[in-house]
Amino acid sequence: MDFSKENTQIRYLNSLLVPETGSTSIPDDTLDRHCLKTETTTENLVAALGGSGLIVLFPNSPSGLLGAHYTKTPQGSLIFDKAITTSQDLKKAYNYARLVSRIVQVRSSTLPAGVYALNGTFNGVTYIGSLSEIKDLDYNSLLSATANINDKVGNVLVGDGVAVLSLPAGSDLPYVRLGDEVPSSAGVARCSPSDRPRHYNANNKQVQVGTTDTKTNGFNIDATTPTEVTVDMQIAQIAAGKTLTVTVKLMGLTGAKVASRSETVSGNGGTFHFSTTAVFGETEITQPVVGVQVLAKTNGDPIVVDSYVGVTVHGGNMPGTLRPVTIIAYESVATGSVLTLSGISNYELIPNPELAKNIQTSYGKLNPAEMTYTKVVLSHRDELGLRSIWSIPQYRDMMSYFREVSDRSSPLKIAGAFGWGDLLSGIRKWVFPVVDTLLPAARPLTDLASGWIKNKYPEAASGRPLAASGRPMAASGTFSKRIPLASSDEIDYQSVLALTIPGTHPKLVPPTEREPNSTPDGHKITGAKTKDNTGGDVTVVKPLDWLFKLPCLRPQAADLPISLLQTLAYKQPLGRNSRIVHFTDGALFPVVAFGDNHSTSELYIAVRGDHRDLMSPDVRDSYALTGDDHKVWGATHHTYYVEGAPKKPLKFNVKTRTDLTILPVADVFWRADGSADVDVVWNDMPAVAGQSSSIALALASSLPFVPKAAYTGCLSGTNVQPVQFGNLKARAAHKIGLPLVGMTQDGGEDTRICTLDDAADHAFDSMESTVTRPESVGHQAAFQGWFYCGAADEETIEELEDFLDSIELHSKPTVEQPQTEEAMELLMELARKDPQMSKILVILGWVEGAGLIDALYNWAQLDDGGVRMRNMLRNLPHEGSKSQRRKHGPAPESRESTRMEVLRREAAAKRKKAQRISEDAMDNGFEFATIDWVLENGSRGPNPAQAKYYKATGLDPEPGLTEFLPEPTHAPENKAAKLAATIYGSPNQAPAPPEFVEEVAAVLMENNGRGPNQAQMRELRLKALTMKSGSGAAATFKPRNRRPAQEYQPRPPITSRAGRFLNISTTLS
C-alpha cells in the first residue's frame, strides 16, 4: 500500500471508467517492475457499397491487436477490410504487457461528395464468449446475442457514435508475452504470445476421399496468435504411384481462408498411418480465425480413410483477447462515408533489454482497499449502471457520475439521483471503515442491489433506471404524491423539512417569500422557486425562523441502532431458547441490528406489563422512559453515540399510561378473538433504541388485540415522521407474512400512514373481528410533537392556519367592568408592596397591550410546566438584532434610541469585519487595503483586478475596480527613461514610475553618464521590486538627498586639487 500520501481518488477505477485520464498501476499483488504507457488508435473505416459493415473488437486484449473491420456486400457476404491495432507495434520495444484500461469510440462526422445528410445507425453488443460462438451476425439479430441490457445498445445514430469500455472480468491479470523477437543464430525467432493455449480435439469416422477436395473434418476455433494444427489419419490401401494430398485451412469470419498448409504422401500399395503438423506463424494470421478445415484428395481411384481422422489444434490464445468480444454492426450508411475509430489503451509494459537501459521502471504498489473497492464496484456494475458499451453522448453525460464513483470522499449527489447512492455508500463504508464510528457497514450489498434497486427503479430498454413516470430519476425531496414537483436548485430538501400544499397560502411562508413565483407551466409557487412544472398553484412550507425556536420542532426522526461493546453483533441463530406465550394485546415492529460486516432485521412485539422473565439476561435491566415517565423494558437506557458524539439517553415521544415490555419474536399465531400466541426467543441481540417503535408502543398501550401488521415510524404528537432502513425492516415483517405499515425515507413500507389515527384505522381493518374502537386511541398517546407529513391534506392545512392564527398579534375585545377595575387596583396595591408582583403586573400589561392573551393562553394549555417556553426564551435573540428585524420588521418610531443602538452595533460589526479583512490583505502584501479602503470596497478585500493593478503600477487601486488591462509601454525618449524601463520590467508591463526614473537619472549623473555598476544595479532592481510589490521592504532604504533629474551635461575639467574637493562637496550637498 502506498503510505506516502492520503488520496481519496481510486485511481485504478478512475482509469477504468475514464481511460482518457491516463494509465496507472493496478494495485494488486503483481509487483513486477514496469513502466506506464498510453497508446492511441486511429482508423478511418470507409463504408463500402451498400453502407453496411461489421466492427469486431477485443476490449480486454493486452496486446496491440484491438479488432478488425469487415464490409458487407449488397448480397450480404462479409469481406475483410483491415485489422485494428495500436499506433505503435508494442512487441518491437516491449516483451510483456498488461492492459489497465481501454476505450474505443466509433462515429461518423463526414459526408461523401453529393450526400447532404448523415445517415446510418449502429447496433452494438458485448458477448461474454468468443467470436465463433455467435451464430447470427445480421444487423437486426445481433442484439439477441445477450439478454443483459447493460451490454448492448441499439439504433444509435452514426453521428452520435458508440463507445466500448474495457471492464475486466477478473483481478488476477498476468503479464503476457507480446511475441517479441528472441536471439537466434539464423533468421527471425519469436516467443509465442499464446501464453495460455487452447486445445481442440475432433475425430471423424470412416471417410471416402475422391479426386476432388473432400472435407474430412471441420470445426470452430478462435485464434489471433500463432497456431499449430496436427492431423492424424489411418489410410487404406493406395496404389503405388498414386498420391494423397492433405490440406489444412484456417478460416476467417468471412468464410474465406486465412492461411493454409498442404502435404502430399505417395502410395505404397498397403495400409499405413499418416500424421502431419501445420504451423501457422504470426505473419500469416492477418485476421481473426474462427474455424479450421482439413481437406483431402487423391489423383487416382477413391480411397477410404479407415478408423478415424483426428485433428488437434494447439495455441491461438492470449488471456483477455478472445473473450469477451464486442461486435458493432452499422447499416444504411452512405457509400464512401468515413467512420472514425479512435481508441485509448493504457498499459503496464516491461521493456526489452535494449529499452530497459534508457527507461525507468518502478514496482507496482499494493493497495488492498483500493483493489477491493474496485472489485466490489465492478461486481455490482449492473446495479450501478456501469455499461460495457455506450452511446457517446450518454457516456459523456455520465462523466460526473464516474468521478463520484471513483472518489470515495465525494458526495453521492448524482448517484443518489439515480437511486444508486445507498449501494455506493454501503460499499464505501464496508471497504473504507471510518475509525471513529462504533460499528462497520450496515447494509448487505447483494440483497440491496438485487432487490431494492430493481424493484424500485425498473429498467428501460436502454438500461437506464427510470422513475414511475418514465423520466430519469432526479434528486427530489419529500413532496405530496399528488403534485408532480421535482427538485429545485434553490432549496436543499435533503436537509430542510418541507411540505408542498396545493393552492396559495401566503400566511404559511415567511414575509419575505410571500410573493408567488412563476413556474414553466404558467402556475404559481409560493415559498420557493422551481425550474420544473408543478401542474397547479402550490405552496412550499418550510420551518419558519420563529418555529425553529420551538423545542417541539425536532429534526427528522431516524433509527439510531445502538450496540454496547459487549453485545456488538447478532451471533446466535434465531429460535434459540424460544417459548410460546399467549398475549391478549400488543403491537409488532421491526428493528435493525448492526454487527461485524453484516446487519440483520428482526421483529419485536410491545406488550403491556413487566415480562422480563422472557427476556435475555443481558438486557433485563435495560429500559427507556416514555413521555409520562413509564418504563419500556428491553429498550436501552444507556447514553448512545451518533458519529462519535454522545447523545442523551433515549426517551420515547409517546405516553403509554403503563409500563411496557418489548420482546423478540420468531413467529405469531392469531386466535379468533384477536389475541395471539407469540414465539418469543432469546436471540442475544442488544437492547432496542430509536424512535421507530413509538407507533407500536402507542398502539400496544391502547388496543385490546394484536394487529396483523408490523408498524414503524416516529410519532411527533399524533403525526408520523419517516424513519430509515425501510427495506430491511420490511424483510423482517415479510418473513412471517405481515405487511410493513408506517413511513420510511426509502419507501420500503407496504402501506404509508401519516397520523396515529391512520395506524389505528389500519389495525382495526387488519382484524376480522367485532372489536369496537375506543375513543382514546390516537389522543392520549400524544406527547410534545409537531407534524411532519409527506402528503399534505386539507386537515393539515387547517391545522397550520389555525395555529398561525392563534399567534397573530390580536386578541378578543375585553369588556370594562367595575370588578375588573377593583381587581386591578388591588393588584397595583400589592405590586407596591411586593417587587415580584410588580414584575407580574408589568408582564400582564405588556401581554394585554400586545394582544397576546389568547395566544399565550393556548400555549399554556400545551406547555405543561413551561418547559417549552423556558427553552424558547433561552434561545431568544437579543432585541434589535438582524434576525429580529428580518422576522418582525423595523422597530417602532418611538424607539429611536434602540434603532440608533442597532445601527451603531451594525457599523461596529462591519468595521470589525473590515479590520480582519484588512489585516489579511496586508499580510499578503497589499499595503493599500486599509480599513477605510475595505469599507469603501463593499467590505471586501482586493479582487484579482485590484491586485493586478497594484502589482503592475505600484499605485493604490480605486475601490470597486473590477477590470484592469495594462497599457503597453512606449520607448522612452531619453537615456534615463530607457534604462529605467529596462530595469523596472518587461515592455508589456506598466511603465516605470517617475520616482524610479529620477533614481536612475541620479545614478547616471553620479557615474558621469555611464550605466550603473553591479552594486548600483542590484540596488536599483531591489527598489524596482519594492515599488512593484508594494511591500514594507521599502522602509529598509534610507532616502538619499539627490538633486532633481536633468539632462546630462559634462562637467568642465578641474585641475587643482582644492577644486576637486570643492566639486565633490558641492555634489554631496
Swiss-Prot record:
Record site: Cleavage: 417-418, 460-461, 467-468, 474-475, 486-487, 557-558, 791-792
Keywords attached to this entry: Capsid protein, Host cytoplasm, Hydrolase, Metal-binding, Protease, Serine protease, T=13 icosahedral capsid protein, Virion
Record-annotated disulphide pairs: none
GO molecular function: metal ion binding; serine-type peptidase activity; structural molecule activity
Residue spans of biased composition, Basic and acidic residues class: 512-534
A Gene Ontology term for the protein's cellular component: host cell cytoplasm
Broad EC category: hydrolase
Keyword Nucleotide-binding included in the entry's annotation: no
Positions that bind a divalent metal cation: 28
InterPro entries found in the cross-reference section: Birna_VP2 (IPR002662), Birna_VP3 (IPR002663), Birna_VP3_dom1 (IPR043048), Birna_VP3_dom2 (IPR043049), Birna_VP4_Prtase_dom (IPR025775), Viral_coat (IPR029053)
Domain of life of the source: Viruses
Processing and modification events after translation: Specific enzymatic cleavages yield mature proteins. The capsid assembly seems to be regulated by polyprotein processing. The protease VP4 cleaves itself off the polyprotein, thus releasing pre-VP2 and VP3 within the infected cell. During capsid assembly, the C-terminus of pre-VP2 is further processed by VP4, giving rise to VP2, the external capsid protein and three small peptides that all stay closely associated with the capsid.
Annotated spans, Disordered: 504-534, 876-900, 1031-1069
PROSITE patterns, alphabetized: BIRNAVIRUS_VP4_PRO
Classification via Pfam families: Birna_VP2, Birna_VP3, Birna_VP4
Residue positions of the active site: 692 (nucleophile), 729
EC numbers, comma separated: 3.4.21.-
General function of this protein: Capsid protein VP2 self assembles to form an icosahedral capsid with a T=13 symmetry, about 70 nm in diameter, and consisting of 260 VP2 trimers. The capsid encapsulates the genomic dsRNA. VP2 is also involved in attachment and entry into the host cell. The precursor of VP2 plays an important role in capsid assembly. First, pre-VP2 and VP2 oligomers assemble to form a procapsid. Then, the pre-VP2 intermediates may be processed into VP2 proteins by proteolytic cleavage mediated by VP4 to obtain the mature virion. The final capsid is composed of pentamers and hexamers but VP2 has a natural tendency to assemble into all-pentameric structures. Therefore pre-VP2 may be required to allow formation of the hexameric structures.
Name this polypeptide is given: Structural polyprotein
Species of origin: Blotched snakehead virus (BSNV)
